[in-house]
Swiss-Prot record:
GO terms for molecular function: ABC-type ferric iron transporter activity; ATP binding; ATP hydrolysis activity. It catalyses: Fe(3+)(out) + ATP + H2O = Fe(3+)(in) + ADP + phosphate + H(+). This is Fe(3+) ions import ATP-binding protein FbpC 1. The lineage of its organism: Bacteria, Pseudomonadati, Pseudomonadota, Alphaproteobacteria, Hyphomicrobiales. Pfam families: ABC_tran (PF00005), TOBE_2 (PF08402). GO terms for cellular component: ATP-binding cassette (ABC) transporter complex. PANTHER family: SPERMIDINE/PUTRESCINE IMPORT ATP-BINDING PROTEIN POTA, SPERMIDINE_PUTRESCINE IMPORT ATP-BINDING PROTEIN POTA. Its EC number is 7.2.2.7. PROSITE patterns: ABC_TRANSPORTER_1 (PS00211), ABC_TRANSPORTER_2 (PS50893), FBPC (PS51242). Part of the ABC transporter complex FbpABC involved in Fe(3+) ions import. Responsible for energy coupling to the transport system. It comes from the Bacteria. Belongs to the ABC transporter superfamily. Fe(3+) ion importer (TC 3.A.1.10) family. Keywords: ATP-binding, Cell inner membrane, Cell membrane, Ion transport, Iron, Iron transport, Membrane, Nucleotide-binding, Plasmid, Translocase, Transport. It comes from Rhizobium meliloti (strain 1021). It is a peripheral membrane protein.
Length: 353
């Protein structure tokens, strides 16, 4: 089974209101064919409303939605060339896996024999060959999720929609299934729109991430760009923990800036900043600690936690309390240790407040 024509997605000035409440004020975005794009954000940010409008389960108050170049703004869900994988899987409990996967095909008028053959192909595609006769209750959570993905894929949609698809799985299974989804998307080349509030999922599966806040796009770009060069304190903290530290930009030379925190100076990407007060996002693993009472930037460890493959510290400094992650478990430092603080080359970014 192949996806012959992955579709693009375009939102043009979409507004969505529920009574007097405006969930999406003015949203414009473009998703290229054959890419997996994640809508990421906290609860209430508008990501699920956006997905539901794309699926045809909600209609915008104003604006246009195009799929594969076709205006589908007011089309009902059953007339859109999309398939959706729900958070709850939405499998029929009285049907076996094969019948669940074949259901959409038969409902669209395909002959039963052909539908079941394609359903068997779909189950094999997601790694469940020979399991078609099992009821959902006889499958693990991960297997049920794969049945739901197979059911969506056999319809050969232009766009596959995934709404929090891993939220009902335990942590270890989530890692495995997200890898399977990403490998499947890359192998078949279909367009996918993936909704989650989990930044690890978004980083692991996406070609691009759209971070939403209050119904607007806070930042979008490739995963690495959003993680390493967040545009704001909100993005820095939402894309993984970050220390937000006050600093001074003391010099700008081309695309680079020299910043100062206390008496520590460091070179970072200038990002169009001018000399003066600024904010710095510092990843916990971009900080190094050395036992020392002296240094250009010093502090005192107030808390130490050993977590097997790394040690976490809280360090009290004149610039505020820093959260630090250090892989050097063999030399864990005790609370009340005075330390000199330095920054690594990567994981430091100037941000807008």
């Amino acid at each position: 089974m192949t996806v012959v024509a992955p579709g693009s997605v375009v939102f043009r000035n979409i507004c969505k209101q529920f009574g007097a409440f405006t969930a999406i004020p003015d949203l414009s975005l473009t998703i290229e064919p054959g890419t997996l794009v994640t809508l990421l954000g906290p609860s209430g940010c508008g990501k699920t409303t956006t997905l539901r409008m794309l699926a045809g389960l909600e209609h915008p108050t104003s604006g246009r939605i195009l799929i594969g170049g076709k205006d589908v703004t007011m089309l009902p869900a059953n007339e859109r060339d999309v398939s959706m994988v729900f958070q709850s899987y939405a499998l029929f409990p009285h049907m076996n896996a094969l019948d669940n996967v074949a259901y959409g095909l038969e409902s669209s008028g395909m002959r039963r024999k052909e539908a079941r053959e394609r359903a068997e192909e779909g189950l094999a595609l997601v790694g469940l060959p020979g399991m078609g006769q099992r009821l959902p209750a006889e499958l693990s959570g991960g297997q049920q999720q794969r049945v739901a993905v197979a059911r969506a894929l056999v319809l050969e949609p232009q766009v596959l929609l995934l709404d929090e698809p891993l939220s009902n799985l335990d942590a270890r299974l989530r890692r495995r299934v997200r890898t399977e989804i990403r490998e499947l998307q890359q192998r078949l080349g279909f367009t996918a729109v993936y909704v989650t509030h989990d930044q690890d999922e978004a980083l692991a599966v996406s070609d691009r991430i759209i971070v939403m806040k209050d119904g607007n796009i806070a930042q979008e770009g490739p995963p690495r760009e959003l993680y390493e060069t967040p545009a704001s304190a909100f993005i820095a903290d939402f894309m993984g923990e970050a220390n937000v530290v006050a600093c001074d930009v003391i010099d700008v030379d081309g695309h680079e800036a020299t910043i100062r925190v206390e008496r520590l100076t460091h070179r970072v990407s200038g990002r169009g900043m001018r000399p003066g007060p600024a904010k710095l996002a510092v990843r916990p693993n971009a900080i190094t600690l050395e036992p020392s009472a002296a240094g250009s930037f010093s502090g005192e460890i107030t808390h130490t936690a050993y977590l097997g493959d790394h040690v976490e510290y809280e360090v009290k400094t004149a610039a505020g309390t820093l959260f630090v992650v250090d892989p050097a478990v063999e030399r864990a430092l005790a609370p009340q240790t005075n330390v000199a603080i330095a920054f690594k080359e990567r994981g430091i970014a100037l941000i807008n407040g």
